[in-house]
Swiss-Prot record:
Sorted UniProt keywords: Amino-acid biosynthesis, Cobalt, Diaminopimelate biosynthesis, Hydrolase, Lysine biosynthesis, Metal-binding, Zinc
NCBIfam families with a match to the protein in the record: dapE_proteo (TIGR01246), PRK13009.1 (NF009557)
PROSITE patterns: ARGE_DAPE_CPG2_1, ARGE_DAPE_CPG2_2
Pfam families given in the database record: M20_dimer, Peptidase_M20
Organism of provenance: Blochmanniella floridana
Disulfide bonds: none
CDD domains, alphabetized: M20_DapE_proteobac
Name by which UniProt lists this protein: Succinyl-diaminopimelate desuccinylase
GO MF annotation: an example: succinyl-diaminopimelate desuccinylase activity
Length: 384
């Protein structure tokens, strides 16, 4: 088992699949699934590679579907000279696999696939259906990935009962945290207009940087939620970029014409896109500035009520790893926000998240084996 896990994880890491480029990952995955008699349906959209794959049990008319969902795309590695080993080498050192995507989430994909092979070899006449959704557009816009697949599946009345997403949910040990929801996200750009002028004559200019300071203070100190959420962390804002126009580094005696501020909200079930938009506009109206506000992207929060799948996973992790998993909704967005539309119970369970998107991203071989074992045990509980 461990040799298969290492080989498959390395094969996937060695594909430099920077979002949304799949870069041959899905061929590796589909070849693996075809050898297990899966039906493979490509659902490519624009520049994104997608697959829907499934294998029926012995009853093709009345069955439960367990879906594994994941992504093959990764974020850029940054300066490769800062890496201990080349980011797309899949180097193993001291029982740790290094490489971009090792924990987010090519290791989890390999663990799912190897667990599926082990399950089918042990139970070739299983009752229920196993399915996979794989996309190369999760780290990017998400427009052409799982969102498109789910839309097609809903249109043709595909039924999904349970879903495991291989996002890196664990904090210190595999299975110590599982997620059943995520906050929503919305990104905006605020342009504050001033007037350019000589710094020695403040009476003849409007410095947009000065105009922005009290606005920034207000934005960062506002309580956005009407009530405390019992399901999610508080709604929060982060400023992501700040720059002026024109950018003039050759002199320090001129003020800019405009200040451009990019920001991102992570919002819970006590706030909405509409309420955030309204509150931002109310704040800006109090400062008598000329501005333009543009909203660039959004995703809604999702929450999956704990049910049979959660109970199964908690029991497995307690029994085999002596850990009581914490159930929470922290972290960034995930494709669970699209899959929730199917009505499936969703859990995110994957590798440790302490090196994701970082230089020297890695996954421990012991953790990889544990993750695959947990997936296998879940299949035993649901698919037989």
């Amino acid at each position: 088992m461990i040799n298969d896990l290492i080989t498959l994880t390395q094969q996937l890491i060695r594909q430099p699949s920077i979002t949304p480029n799949d870069c041959n990952c899905q061929k590796i995955i589909t070849d693996y699934l075809k050898s297990l008699q899966f039906n493979i349906e490509p659902m490519n959209s624009s520049n994104t590679s997608n697959i829907w794959a499934y294998r029926y049990g012995y009853d093709q008319k009345k069955y439960t579907t367990l879906l594994f969902a994941g992504h093959t795309d990764v974020v850029p590695p940054g300066d490769i000279h800062n890496w201990q080993y080349p980011p797309f080498s899949g180097t193993v050192h001291n029982n740790i696999i290094y490489g971009r995507g090792s924990s987010d989430m090519k290791g989890a994909l390999a663990a799912m696939l190897v667990a599926t092979k082990s399950f089918i070899q042990k139970y070739p006449k299983h009752k229920n259906r196993i399915a996979f959704i794989i996309t190369s557009d999760e780290e990017g816009s998400g427009i052409h990935g799982t969102k498109k697949i789910i839309k097609s599946l809903i249109h043709r009345h595909e039924h999904i009962n349970y879903c495991i997403i291989g996002e890196p949910s664990s904090n210190n040990k595999i299975g110590d945290v599982i997620k059943n929801g995520r906050r929503g996200s919305c990104t905006g750009k605020l342009v504050i207009h001033g007037s350019q002028g000589h710094v020695a004559y403040p009476q003849f200019l409007k410095n947009p940087i000065h105009l922005a300071i009290p606005i920034l203070s207000k934005l960062l100190n506002t309580m956005w939620d009407q009530h405390k959420s019992t399901l999610f962390p508080d709604t929060s804002i982060q400023i992501t970029h700040l720059h002026t126009i024109p950018i003039n580094y050759s002199t320090n005696n001129i003020t800019p014409e405009q200040l451009i501020l990019n920001f991102n909200f992570r919002f819970n079930d006590q706030s909405t896109m509409h309420s955030i938009h309204n509150n931002i506009n109310k704040i800006l109206s109090n400062y008598h500035v000329t501005y333009h506000l543009h909203w660039e992207s959004k995703s809604e929060p999702y929450f999956s009520a704990p049910g049979k799948l959660v109970n199964i996973i908690i029991d497995i992790i307690k029994k085999y790893y002596n850990i009581t998993p914490q159930l929470n909704t922290t972290g960034g967005t995930s494709d669970g926000r699209f899959i929730i539309q199917t009505g499936a119970e969703i859990i995110e369970l994957g590798a440790l998240n302490n090196t994701i998107h970082k230089v020297n991203e890695c996954i421990d071989l012991v953790d990889l084996k544990s993750l695959s074992h947990i997936y296998f045990k879940i299949m035993e509980k649901i698919l037989l």
